[in-house]
Amino acid sequence: MNISIITFTENGTKLAEKIRQAFVGTKTEEAKKLGLSLSDWTRQQFAEKNAIVVIGACGIAVRMIAPFVSDKLSDSPVVVADEAGTFVIPLLSGHMGGANELAEQIAGQIGGIPVITTATDVNHTFSVDLFAKKCGLSIYNREGIAKVSAKILDGKTPDIVISSEKTDLEQGVLGLQPREYIL
């Protein structure tokens, strides 16, 4: 995963340096020294599918990324850390993009607290999208993610179909398909 860090203050830049030490190849950029607009920088990160770490307020991060957010299955992961390094928050693409895991790694590196808010994580239950990612499966009916997750969180048995071909599914059933076949 390529990681780009954006900072807005000297303290933020110092914290970014601590983070960079744990992630080889991480780029750190100070907003005032970008040479392009914050919007153009953010567009570039999304286009390159880079993970974005914002050292600053969540509000700044939300305003930065809002025009570029399109799909939970393909958006760049976005993590926010306050400039003191106290809290590290996965803001976008927690499971499929890896923002939750990245937030935990960053928090471990800087001595911060990861603030994970995804329901399956806080309830310590099965996450179907994380399962799909780890097993190399693609989700072909994305509307099934929320329905299956809700069933799991309610203690009900979910309906999941794993098939080599896309099939028509009843509402509330999640369809998964292998990304590649190994013979």
Predicted features and spans:
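Short, solvent-exposed amphipathic alpha-helical segments in soluble enzyme
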Residues: K18-V24, P67-L73, M96, F131-A132, ...
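Short, acidic/small-residue loops that bind anionic groups at enzyme active sites
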Residues: V69-G94, E101-Q105, Q109-T117
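General beta-strand structural signal in soluble alpha/beta enzymes
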Residues: K27-L34, V53-G56, V80-A81, P114-T118, ...
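N-terminal basic/disordered segments at the start of proteins
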Residues: M1-T28
